[in-house]
């Protein structure tokens, strides 16, 4: 195929960073197969929507996006609309019936075949659906095409999950936990760093389970120790750490290794033991409190992020009050709150004492208001301190302000630092003095 006749493909990725990596892998396969990648959907011959169906809101966003692009398909040059990921893996038959506008559905196990499936579609008018076993694990030979800014990337160290929490559909959509080989991860990381990446964000459904299923059982700590040897890599961030997998050796590594961000994403989901038990979480209240105390004792400046679920079946008023009080007392640096989503096929969906949507929303609002106060007070304590900040570009509001993130702020989910004085290039890591703060963001000036 000549350069002039290359078909253009655009990919929209929804959901979590793990989905984004899947999207980048698919783009790599397509670019390797002589498709030209474009970010302009109006110029694309083929549009791919990589979907999420983890909770109700994610499913709705995926459906809305598909319908929007299906409408555009009639107005633009798009010839094929492809839906990939968790949504077709879970709802293949329903989607095929309800969305005739979609030409191809591809589940989470068939990403490597995307170019082959497109070629097959060009030989038939029929809608194609491929949703085999979700057991795909990519290696460093897969041509991942990075779509995030050049200075930051996600490194997906494992696929699937074997924790089997009672509310979660991930094992059925992604399969059981499968660690990627250490050599594969190091080769991919090396390529990313040589391409300009300064910040690697390690992700999986549970990063602390890394290596348990591999020969020799290489640990998360070993992976980190190998990554820090890469001279041009400046920050390593740990996301999605299951509480009972956070070992003393991991805590010491975060404490002592300068390249490991003093940051830990630690989803605990709740603090009430009856709720945690019904969720099938392995860590109870005592273990969670002990771990958080240990982290802060060993690493006083660590930023702890967590995720919580409100309105889980059987969550009483007292359970919620306990959670609210816990958030006030614990003072998490970052916090995400989700209303429980009743997902077909999960044990929690069949539990008695389902909580009404109204009460879920009320509890969500109360928890977020509490966290806003906690975050505001914490950010005020940072005024006049200094932070290393990764510059990400100009503020959306004005080009008079640069913006960035400190090592205590993860991409996409945490706040930002706005830079009011000093010059820097995108991708630079600069020293900043914090001069002001808001609920979630910081303001500062570059210091010499």
From Swiss-Prot:
Cofactor dependence: [4Fe-4S] cluster
What is the E.C. number? 2.8.4.4
Spell out the SUPFAM superfamilies in the cross-references.
Radical SAM enzymes (SSF102114)
Q: Where is it localised?
A: Cytoplasm
Residues of the TRAM domain: 380-448
Q: Where is the Radical SAM core domain?
A: 147-377
Binding-site list for [4Fe-4S] cluster 2: 161, 165, 168
Q: Name the Gene Ontology molecular function terms of this record.
A: 4 iron, 4 sulfur cluster binding; aspartic acid methylthiotransferase activity; metal ion binding; protein methylthiotransferase activity
Quickly give the catalysed reaction.
Answer: L-aspartate(89)-[ribosomal protein uS12]-hydrogen + (sulfur carrier)-SH + AH2 + 2 S-adenosyl-L-methionine = 3-methylsulfanyl-L-aspartate(89)-[ribosomal protein uS12]-hydrogen + (sulfur carrier)-H + 5'-deoxyadenosine + L-methionine + A + S-adenosyl-L-homocysteine + 2 H(+)
What does the note accompanying the cofactor annotation read?
Binds 2 [4Fe-4S] clusters. One cluster is coordinated with 3 cysteines and an exchangeable S-adenosyl-L-methionine.
Q: Which family does it belong to?
A: Belongs to the methylthiotransferase family. RimO subfamily.
Q: What is this protein called?
A: Ribosomal protein uS12 methylthiotransferase RimO
Name the source organism.
Citrifermentans bemidjiense (strain ATCC BAA-1014 / DSM 16622 / JCM 12645 / Bem) (Geobacter bemidjiensis)
- Tell me what gene encodes this: rimO
């Amino acid at each position: 195929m000549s350069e002039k006749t290359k078909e253009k493909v655009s990919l929209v990725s929804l959901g979590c960073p793990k989905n984004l990596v899947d999207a980048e892998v698919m783009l790599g396969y397509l670019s390797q197969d002589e498709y030209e990648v474009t970010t302009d959907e109006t110029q694309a011959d083929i549009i791919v929507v990589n979907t999420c169906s983890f909770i109700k809101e994610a499913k709705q966003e995926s459906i809305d996006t598909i319908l929007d692009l299906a409408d555009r398909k009639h107005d633009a040059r798009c010839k094929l609309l492809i839906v990939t990921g968790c949504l077709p893996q879970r709802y293949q038959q329903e989607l095929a019936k309800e969305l005739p506008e979609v030409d191809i559905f591809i589940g989470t196990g068939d990403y490597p075949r995307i170019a082959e499936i497109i070629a097959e579609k060009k030989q038939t008018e029929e809608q194609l659906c491929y949703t085999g076993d979700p057991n795909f694990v990519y290696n460093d030979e897969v041509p991942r095409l990075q779509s995030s800014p050049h200075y930051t990337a996600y490194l997906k160290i494992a696929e699937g999950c074997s924790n089997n929490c009672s509310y979660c559909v991930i094992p059925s959509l992604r399969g059981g936990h499968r660690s990627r080989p250490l050599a594969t991860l190091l080769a991919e990381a090396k390529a990313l760093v040589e391409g300009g990446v300064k910040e690697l964000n390690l992700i999986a459904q549970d990063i602390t389970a890394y290596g348990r299923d591999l020969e020799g059982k290489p640990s998360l700590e070993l992976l980190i120790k190998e990554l820090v040897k890469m001279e041009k890599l400046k920050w390593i961030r740990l996301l999605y750490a299951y509480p009972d997998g956070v070992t003393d050796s991991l805590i010491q590594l975060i404490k002592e290794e300068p390249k490991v961000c003093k940051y830990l994403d630690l989803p605990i989901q709740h603090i009430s033991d009856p709720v945690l038990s019904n969720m099938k979480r392995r860590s109870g209240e005592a273990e969670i409190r002990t771990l958080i105390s240990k982290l802060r004792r060993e690493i006083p400046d660590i930023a702890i992020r967590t995720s919580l679920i409100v309105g889980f079946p059987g969550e009483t008023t007292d359970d919620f009050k306990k959670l609210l009080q816990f958030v006030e007392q614990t003072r998490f640096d970052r916090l995400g709150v989700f209303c429980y989503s009743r997902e077909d096929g999960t044990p929690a969906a069949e539990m008695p004492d389902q909580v009404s949507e109204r009460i879920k929303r009320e509890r969500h609002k109360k928890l977020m208001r509490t966290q806003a106060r906690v975050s505001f007070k914490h950010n005020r304590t940072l005024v006049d301190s200094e932070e290393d900040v990764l510059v990400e570009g100009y503020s959306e509001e004005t080009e008079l302000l640069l913006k960035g993130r400190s090592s205590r702020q993860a991409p996409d989910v945490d706040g930002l630092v706005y830079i009011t004085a000093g010059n820097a290039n995108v991708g630079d890591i600069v020293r900043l003095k914090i001069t002001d703060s808001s609920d979630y963001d910081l303001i500062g000036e570059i210091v010499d």
